[in-house]
Design a protein with these regions (language model features):
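Short beta-strand and adjacent tight-turn residues that come in two discontinuous sequence segments
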Residues: 106
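Active-site-proximal, substrate-binding regions of enzyme catalytic domains
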Residues: 2-5, 9-101, 109, 120, ...
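Acidic, PIN/NYN-like endoribonuclease modules and their adjacent C-terminal/linker elements
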Residues: 112-173
């Protein structure tokens, strides 16, 4: 796949379980806005979160922090009125439009819904795992372990989705 813009939660979760590199197996270029960097690196380091240091290292090499331009900020200012989105999600969606990035990596339901309205394809942390499996970057067993690790690290999914994900993993060749 081509380029994608990421929100904070997938970065945090993947870094926590030591699988941030999965993103590189799916996307050629990954971008984040300043608000996401502030949340995952600056605030994370202030809280002494190990994942913050992992993500910071990636932002120096293969994850590209890119500011949202004033022009795009003005054009998509209506996103700022959506109280269900945090600043990182708003900036990330604007950055998708600015870069013509077809993919938005996010787990938040509202942010994914808004992405679809903007003709951006949302993909969550579980979707990244499934895509990595389909690309042959990981095995079925690794995919199962990643899903379990993500849940242990704070990914919230209901039983129905969990079963569906395991079925998809099992049926993947």
């Amino acid at each position: 796949m081509s380029k994608a813009v990421s929100d904070s939660t997938p970065l945090i979760l993947l870094a926590k379980i030591g699988r941030l590199e999965l993103l590189k197996t799916i996307f050629n270029n990954i971008y984040i806005p300043e608000a996401v960097t502030n949340k995952v690196v600056t605030k994370g380091k202030n809280l002494n979160q190990p994942d913050a240091y992992i993500i910071e290292k990636a932002t120096k090499t293969w994850i590209h922090e890119t500011p949202v331009t004033n022009e795009i900020n003005t054009e998509y200012i209506y996103l700022d009125t959506n109280t269900r989105l945090d600043e990182g999600e708003k900036q990330a969606l604007k950055l998708c439009k600015q870069l013509n990035a077809p993919y938005f990596i996010a787990d938040d339901k509202e942010a994914r819904k808004v992405a679809k309205l903007l003709n951006i394809k949302p993909i969550g942390t579980l979707g990244v795992t499934i895509q990595a499996l389909k690309n042959g970057a990981i095995t079925q067993k690794e995919a199962e372990n990643i899903v379990a690790d993500l849940i242990t690290s704070g990914l919230r999914i209901d039983t129905t989705l969990y079963k569906k994900i395991l079925d998809i993993i099992e049926s993947a060749h």
